[in-house]
Amino acid sequence: MAKKVVGMIKLQLPAGKATPAPPVGPALGQHGVNIMAFCKEYNAKTANQAGMTIPVIISVYQDRSFSFILKTPPAAVLIKKAAGLDSGSGEPNKTKVGKITKAQLKEIAETKMPDLNAGSVESAMSMIAGTARSMGITVEE
């Protein structure tokens, strides 16, 4: 018989750097999960993606065991990394803060494909381009 899921927790954590401190501790503690076990497993699985923020969805079961699914890094994080920026524009419609090329856009779209609701790489590229536009980053040919 399948285990009964009693909670779903969504977090965005730095790769390889999950600690029992907030936000991880309180989120998992209220479901009675072994926090150190999660931190060790998460850090082991994300060690090769250092410097990225990795979203994770944790399923907590009735017997207080857990499983988790790693997602691809948020589009905004990948775009900022490609453009070499720390943050997007405060006024994206007025102030442009950076540029990315079509090739970089395609690379980001291919990275995000598993998590995007897109049928083709072209439609994924237009989604990522929209995110870039809303951050004040222009896409060049």
UniProtKB/Swiss-Prot annotation:
Gene3D superfamilies with a match to the protein in the record: Ribosomal protein L11, C-terminal domain, Ribosomal protein L11/L12, N-terminal domain
Keyword Transmembrane helix: no
Post-translational modification: One or more lysine residues are methylated.
GO biological process: translation
Protein name according to UniProt: Large ribosomal subunit protein uL11
GO cellular component: cytosolic large ribosomal subunit
Regions that span the bilayer: none
SUPFAM superfamilies xrefs: Ribosomal L11/L12e N-terminal domain, Ribosomal protein L11, C-terminal domain
Record-stated family: Belongs to the universal ribosomal protein uL11 family.
Assigned keywords, A-Z: Methylation, Ribonucleoprotein, Ribosomal protein, RNA-binding, rRNA-binding
A single MF term (Gene Ontology): structural constituent of ribosome
A Pfam family annotated for this UniProt entry: Ribosomal_L11
Species per Swiss-Prot/TrEMBL record: Clostridium novyi (strain NT)
